[in-house]
């Protein structure tokens, strides 16, 4: 069995990183010794289900978090470094050079376009250069979908492990009776993820239907956050803003939803990928309204569990909402989706791939 350091790119606890959590539980259950190294608001040692989490304060000059995480990684006598996302990939250059220990890089996101969206062209260009250099030096790359797997495959060995939800965290629950239909969005809120379009469409539909909207997630852009809350107040939408919710606490929120929303905007990186939240909605028996895309359209059609729309058009999104709300088979859609997804799209059916990677490296 191996002593494995899981190195996080961002705060592990808030918002709770459900992919890291699923992976460490999988490794721990297989008998490996796991420690999570993560940026945090303060330096402390915490414990999560028997797993030690070493938290390091983000306070201090630029580069201090990198120094603190690398320092612990070097003195921890670990057998494998499992690095999540971009910054730990950079750290792996140092760790690999000094320890000669195996490194796994887990890439959850399309990092270059994400950096461009959030930080601009220069950050995107630098990210692309670093990925080309650093990813060739790791021992194995893990990622979340086939398109990203093909892109990263030119740099080294790649295994695709989709970020499917776990059955244990999304059990079949008795549906909660609702006084009125409740639309639900779960996840980060950005323009590219459809936050603005979602609110505009909801405003249109609310003029005709007595419905509610629950949002479990947070903003990355303070200007967009201000706009959203101002828009909510101005139009008396009474949105239920829950903020970030722990992954393990989402199931009761899903049980109160009538329709799940996923309105990714028209970008090439989403055409051949399916957002994790869609599988979560399906697993919990919630009909889905989602943006069009080659793979997701096939999924919704086969699962008979919702509707796809042009998510860049608020009016079309609104019409999609109305269509589902008026569909007498809405509840049956949710049942179809749950049955379809529980047989195929759950973490437990893929986690063995992760263990095989570790076994080959130790």
PLM features: what roles do these ranges have?
Residues 37, 259-262, 280-290:
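Short hydrophobic beta-strand element within catalytic cores of glycosyltransferases
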Residues 329-344:
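A short, well-ordered alpha-helix in the C-terminal region of glycosyltransferases
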Residues 40-42, 212-227, 241-243:
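Glycosyltransferase donor-sugar binding loop
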């Amino acid at each position: 069995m191996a002593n494995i350091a899981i190195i996080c790119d961002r705060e592990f606890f808030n918002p709770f990183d459900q992919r890291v959590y699923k992976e460490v539980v999988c490794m721990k259950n297989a008998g490996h010794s796991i420690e999570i190294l993560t940026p945090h608001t303060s330096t402390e040692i915490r414990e999560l289900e028997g797993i030690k989490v070493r938290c390091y304060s983000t306070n201090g000059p630029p580069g201090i978090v990198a120094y603190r995480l690398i320092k612990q990684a070097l003195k921890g006598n670990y057998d494998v470094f499992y690095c999540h996302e971009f910054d730990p990939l950079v750290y792996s250059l140092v760790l690999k050079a000094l320890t000669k220990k195996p490194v796994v890089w887990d890439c959850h996101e399309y990092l270059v376009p994400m950096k461009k969206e959030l930080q601009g062209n220069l950050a995107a260009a630098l990210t692309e250069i670093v990925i080309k250099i650093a990813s060739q030096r790791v021992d194995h790359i893990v990622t979340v979908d086939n398109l990203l797997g093909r892109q990263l495959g030119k740099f080294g060995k790649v295994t695709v492990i989709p970020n499917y939800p776990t059955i244990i965290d999304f059990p079949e629950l008795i549906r909660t009776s609702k006084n009125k239909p409740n639309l639900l969005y779960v996840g980060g809120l950005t323009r590219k993820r459809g936050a603005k379009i979602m609110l505009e469409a909801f405003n249109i539909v609310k003029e005709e239907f007595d419905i509610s909207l629950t949002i479990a997630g947070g903003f990355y852009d303070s200007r967009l956050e201000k706009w959203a809350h101002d828009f909510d107040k101005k139009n008396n939408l009474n949105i239920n803003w829950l903020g970030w919710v722990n992954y393990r606490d989402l199931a009761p929120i899903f049980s109160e939803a009538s329709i799940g929303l996923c309105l990714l905007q028209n970008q090439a990186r989403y055409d051949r990928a399916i957002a994790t939240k869609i599988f979560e909605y399906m697993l919990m028996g919630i009909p889905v309204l989602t943006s069009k895309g080659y793979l997701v359209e096939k999924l919704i059609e086969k699962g008979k569990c919702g509707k796809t729309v042009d998510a860049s058009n608020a009016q079309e999104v609104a019409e999609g909402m109305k269509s589902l709300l008026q569909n007498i088979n809405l509840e049956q859609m949710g049942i179809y989706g749950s049955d379809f997804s529980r047989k195929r799209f759950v973490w437990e059916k893929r986690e063995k791939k992760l263990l095989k990677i570790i076994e080959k490296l130790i």
